Amino acid sequence: MKDLDKKKAVKLLNEIMEFELSGVVRYTHYSLMVFGYNRIPIVSWLKGNADESLAHAHKAGELVTMLGGHPSLKIGALLETEKHHIGDILRESLEHEK
């Protein structure tokens, strides 16, 4: 692979890793904010999303290392809306996945 292509690939993979790490924080936060009698399955689903985001970040980081790059320590944007009703949380989760 050409050096320029490697640099582009590493940059993109680092962006993916940063985005996925923000998902870990976001979904973990959401799982702690859900309340009410129906919370258990929703909390489990949110924790599962956090685990999946961490796995994706790890894969992207491994590819960065494999290409001779340096995995980023940054994290993607985290916006706190202060809305913690389940509908708001699910809408924000959907928006994050787009």
Give names to the regions the model predicted:
Residues 1-98:
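Iron-associated oxidoreductase/ferritin-like identity signal
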